[in-house]
């Protein structure tokens, strides 16, 4: 995510979206803020045309570069389809056993917490550069990117974002 826009552009986009810079990388939150600001900045609604153009340029560039950073499309999945199939409930798909899965991933555990952590370990072994949030969706990259401790509340935030993320982008 840190390679999508340069630092100045990312800070400008977050300011235009009215979000804290710490929220950079929370794509569902950024999308909601973008749609809200489109209504506010729209010239037909009495908004600032220059801000609207600049926000559109930066957001579309960020959105396009995130798509390019992910795997090529091999089907069309929307986040609403994934969320409908799997409810946002950490004790089912996302985290099978909270205290155990949070400490060490198991190859035998089917939950996303363990599977994404194992995927992170495999990819980390094969790459020279470090993995970061959006390049990797594991909870460790999430906590490191946002500067959070690994708690049940953090798990809930991570689950919310993973639930809104298209499955193909998780690179499982």
Swiss-Prot record:
GO terms for molecular function: zinc ion binding. CDD domains: DnaJ. Its main location: host cell. The modification N-acetylmethionine is found at residue 1. Pfam families: Papo_T_antigen. Keywords: Acetylation, Activator, Early protein, Host cytoplasm, Host nucleus, Host-virus interaction, Metal-binding, Oncogene, Phosphoprotein, Transcription, Transcription regulation, Zinc, Zinc-finger. It is found in: Host cytoplasm; Host nucleus. The keyword Transferase does not apply. Interacts with host PPP2R1A; the interaction inhibits PP2A activity. Promotes efficient viral genome replication by accelerating both G1 and S phase progression of the cell cycle. Inhibits host PP2A by binding to the A subunit, thereby displacing lower affinity regulatory B subunit. Inactivation of PP2A in turn results in the transactivation of cyclin A and cyclin D1 promoters. Late during the infection cycle, ST may induce dephosphorylation of host MTOR, leading to the inhibition of cap-dependent translation. May establish and maintain high levels of viral genomes during persistent infection in cell culture. The common region of ST and LT proteins comprises the J domain. This domain is essential for multiple viral activities, including virion assembly, viral DNA replication, transformation and transcriptional activation. This domain is also required for cyclin A-transactivating activity of ST. This is Small t antigen. It comes from BK polyomavirus.
